[in-house]
Amino acid sequence: LTSGTASGKTEAAFLPILTLLAAKPATSIGILYIGPTKALINDQFYRLQGLLEQANIPVWSWHGDVPQNQKQRLLRNPQGILQITPESLEGLLINRSEQLTALFQDLRFVIIDEVHVFMGSDRGQQILCQLARLRRHTQAEPRRVGLSATLGDYASAQRWLAAGSERSVLAPRVGTSGQRLRLSLEHFVRPEAEPESAADDPYYRYLFEQTRGRKCLIFANRRSETEAAVAALRQIAADLGYPDIYHVHHGSIAPTLREAAELAMRDPYLPAVTAATITLELGIDLGQLESIIQLDAPHSVMSFLQRLGRSGRRGGPQEMRMISSEPEAEGSGLVPLPWQLLQSIAIIELYLQDRWLEPVEPPRYPYSLLYHQTMSTLLAAGELQPAQLAHQVLTLPPFKQISQDDYRLLLKHLLAIDHLERLETGSLIIGLAGAKVVGNWRFFAVFQDSDEYSVHDSTKEIGSISSEPAIGDLLTLAGATWEVREVDSQQKRVLVEAAPGRAASFWSGKSVNIHDRVLQQLRQILVESTAEYRYLRPGALARLRQARAWAKQQQLERRQVIPWGGNLFCVFPWCGSISFRTLERVLRLHGQDKLGIRNVIGFAPYYLLVQTEGGSTQQLEQGLTQLSRQTHSGTQLLAPHEEPRLHKFDEFIPGQLLRKGFVG
């Protein structure tokens, strides 16, 4: 079921299922609901409680915040609905393996919320493994229901939902209701030197005016941007005598402060402004929002649509005010193009004109997940013969492309590094080194997590940071500035007190892939189109005109390489992140021999600065064209001894498989 945010998908899925369950109660848990976050599960929990008051169908949540006595009640008398995250479900499969049949033998339905979040991700592949493992404990094949507000590739979603199941999939198309859409996009060129007061920064002053006295959600792509925005808004509000209505919501904010932000947003009588990352992109009910603010370009059309869908509830128009920015390029050596502005327009146009959303492509060789499910399966079973282990693991849906030879190589490696141990009977058990990995609660998750430092003041936890600060450092967290007073490196605990001014954040971010189609649309907007889009505000329109004039001057409509002074050239591949990184890798590994390239600096996924030993622009462009058309084998994309470690458990995978997985 796919339909816009707050359009009733949850009720549409649950009401007929609950009717069936009420008519013929299950003898175990009847419905398994899998959601991406504890917050969404808690939100659904309260909504379902109201639906089920008269039906005598209990609703249970199972995650780290649920009291142990509540879990014991479910184990003693399993029935009704169980709401759970993939990580908690993994823990259930491992730690309650002997009770799984009693818990799930009469499981009728599996409901997976926010399907688009899971598809193509490690967590989504983990869910497919979990459902296949659960099937060994159920009397019949449970029916699966997927819910999503943003879905572009129905065929991929149907394949994903049906993986490992013999059931067919229906995907009813819901017509659009003709909901009105309000968009605006403004742009700012920001000086290198930050003004002393946020009120003197036109960017933040504009943001303040757009949110003043309103119920607004500000989305940013990085935690540091949410912190900087709220710190600036609070400073401006204090200077002008306005109340502090500002909150921050992301994964490194303490749960109590996140809940306070959610409550403030739900209050129908008072204004509130919360800056968030993906944590509020999902379907938590925040009540009637007046507007969504997006800082800089979203990474995908799917993210744009998901964030836009947070507004326009209860029949009102959907509204998003986008604000892009760029640093002053003069004298910096950077290409003077407003990439965030151009990417914002490209994403808007791909949705408005084509209703296009990014397709989902699961990994071909998910070796990190293979390690995880091998250890999880063996931990749950206690011991297994190698053939039994191989059968139980390699029959899981994500591992169809994994050969017996590859799996044999993995098992030999795990024996060699003591993650597995072989008994005299030939059976395999978890080894001493492996026990240290699987014995940590972090093992339940297949996504990368950082070992963060918790930050406290004298009364409460504020949140966490990803690197250790020094005493006296200033840091921004929860939209406020703090001075570090004490650091306990062993306990990873930081004590702070409030401080004036603004400061840096202590997080490291990771890059997100942008699709080829977005960059192709960006090029079309820059060098082919003359359209002046109605949603552009004066600053954005003026900057777009300047960018087009510069692109025309550089003849970018017919050239992809332009001189950049001396033996330095600027290359515009006009391709997405994965293709860009592949080209960059080819140039680094083979550009010296074939094109005389001495150095490559990538500004992914927009342009490359290439330094050569000599030659003309035309020669370099011809050489790059020939090089990019050649078919490069996997080994040609890797340095001789390179073993890329990109996923959580890659450090336990033999190098031969890491290389194969990287190029696969």
Tell what function each PLM region has:
Residues T19-Q44, H137-E141:
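Conserved SF1/SF2 helicase motif Ia
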Residues G30-Q44, G146, F208-I236:
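Conserved strand-helix element at the start of the C-terminal RecA-like helicase core
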Residues I41-H63, R159-E166, A237:
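Conserved helix-turn-beta segment of the N-terminal RecA-like "Helicase ATP-binding" lobe
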Residues G64-R108:
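Conserved helix/coil segment N-terminal to the catalytic DExD/H
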